[in-house]
Design a protein with these regions (language model features):
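Membrane-embedded helix-loop-helix hairpins and adjacent transmembrane boundary segments
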Residues: 1-470
Length: 470
């Protein structure tokens, strides 16, 4: 990289910090801090939703899959986008009108305090761990670009992303996400993809050089595709970071439209990334560590100035996910744990302060964990599996059935989480079967306990009566 590339990178970070300061001036209430006053239009929401789920693993991982197996690698990112779209089409009509802030708040309204607390803990741990992985990713990127020690890079990258998140909350993230979405789109679609195709001789070069298996959409195998759909599609449908973005929309129509656009964009983005990986195999067939496919290809094919934009695009993808998941974890803990159980009588001004302090503490914790574990990222697979296996079914049944009891939901969440953990322990942390086991146990438990627990059905609340009408 040349001085111009470093300058572009530096300007990018300065803009992010400046936006954080502006966001602090805008976020005066907890509602503004957590859901940006529920005032976003379709295009801003689309940019925010896209930016929050397309992180380092989506970008680096998809190009790696393209290098290793070809077009079949699109299932990784597309399964995430599909989950966001399905959430919009299946759930939004039934919940948008109730002004929720968290996924566990919905569990609480449907099934009571115990289920709300379990949901908050599981979802908060999951979102925090996602944030940790993104901090490690931004550290790795900065380390490679500036030749820093990884520890130094993690500290600097973590400080920048968490600085603007702590100050402005969702108002800051809205502005930074739209800005970062634009950088991502330009960097990948306008620069990296065409440059990679040009270096590889276009699509004809790919067809003439790569084996036919690289153009088979099911080459990874139906079992692996099913694993992605169960883990990432269901996980996205019950992810607090995704729900919180949807809650910023002005109305349900806007939210659903943005959700459909995300599904389309995820397909295009995943396609672009795997094609870049395929081009890298043609141009650089000897890459030993396939996690370096994207960065190696960028250094090989992108000219000065444009290279800075491309790496800023990668940084944008990573940092937008890190900030969004941090705020999601903070919202769950500050609202559904601290406020509900320890600070029950605080006014909104004090609650906003509690929210910022919680975000700060979690930011420090995320950086410490990132510095500590670095290579022990299998914890993410465990968190994703527990989230999808234990929370999805109670929410689905709670929204569409009148017969589920609080005891049934609580028992189903605990038993399914236990089942998933035992399954992962026996079959391995990368196995997809434990999620299936968890879902099956969840369904059996919630139906069986509800049947024998009829006498403990709660009186239908105004919230549940509203679901019946939606």
């Amino acid at each position: 990289m040349e001085i111009l590339d470093y300058l572009i990178f530096a300007i990018y970070f300065i803009v992010l910090i400046s936006i954080g300061v502006m966001g602090m001036m805008r976020a005066k209430t907890s509602e503004q801090y957590m859901v940006a006053d529920r005032n976003l239009g379709v295009w801003m929401l689309f940019g925010c939703l896209t930016a929050v789920f397309l992180g380092g693993s989506s970008t680096i991982g998809s190009s790696q899959l393209g290098y290793e197996i070809g077009l079949s690698g699109i299932w990784f990112v597309f399964s995430m986008g599909l989950g966001i779209t399905l959430f919009a089409l299946v759930f939004l009509d039934r919940i948008m009108g109730f002004k929720l802030l968290t996924i566990s708040e919905l569990l609480g309204r449907l099934f009571g305090t115990k289920s709300k607390l379990v949901g908050a803990v599981v979802a908060a741990i999951y979102t925090l761990l996602i944030s940790v992985t993104q901090i490690i990713a931004i550290g790795a990127l900065l380390s490679g670009v500036f030749d820093w020690e990884l520890t130094t890079a993690i500290l600097i990258g973590g400080f920048i992303v968490f600085f603007y998140t702590i100050l402005g909350g969702m108002w800051t993230l809205t502005i930074t996400d739209v800005f970062q979405f634009a950088i991502m789109t330009i960097g990948i679609f306008a620069i990296m993809l065409p440059q990679s195709l040009g270096a590889a001789g276009g699509f004809e070069g790919l067809k003439s050089t790569l084996p036919s298996s690289y153009f088979n959409l099911t080459e990874m195998g139906f079992r692996e595709i099913l694993s992605y759909l169960l883990t990432y599609t269901l996980g996205m449908m019950v992810g607090q970071d995704i729900w919180q973005r949807y809650f910023t929309a002005k109305n349900t129509k806007i939210a659903k439209s943005a959700g459909v656009l995300v599904g389309i964009y995820s397909l295009l983005y995943s396609l672009a990334m795997v094609i870049i990986g395929m081009c890298a195999l043609v141009v650089l067939p000897g890459i030993q560590n396939t996690q370096d496919v994207f960065t190696t290809m960028a250094f090989e094919t992108i000219s000065t100035g444009l290279l800075g934009v491309v790496f800023a695009a990668v940084a944008a993808a990573i940092m937008s996910t890190a900030s969004g998941t941090l705020l999601a974890s903070s919202t769950l803990i500050s609202k559904d744990i601290l406020k509900d159980h320890f600070f029950t009588k605080v006014n909104d001004t004090k609650f906003l302060l509690i929210s910022r302090i919680t975000t700060f503490v979690l930011a420090v914790l995320a950086i410490v964990i990132a510095l500590w574990i670095q290579e022990l990222l299998v914890a993410i697979d465990v968190a994703y599996a527990i989230l999808a296996g234990s929370i999805f079914i109670p929410i689905l049944f709670g929204l569409f059935s009148k017969k589920i009891t609080p005891n049934a939901a609580f028992s189903a969440m605990l038993l399914s989480a236990f089942t998933v953990i035992i399954g992962l322990w026996i079959e391995g942390l990368g196995a997809s079967n434990p999620i299936i086991y968890g879902i099956v146990v969840n369904i059996i438990t919630i139906i069986t306990v509800s049947y024998f627990d009829k006498g403990n059905r709660r009186k239908r609340s105004d919230f549940e009566a509203g679901l019946d009408k939606s």
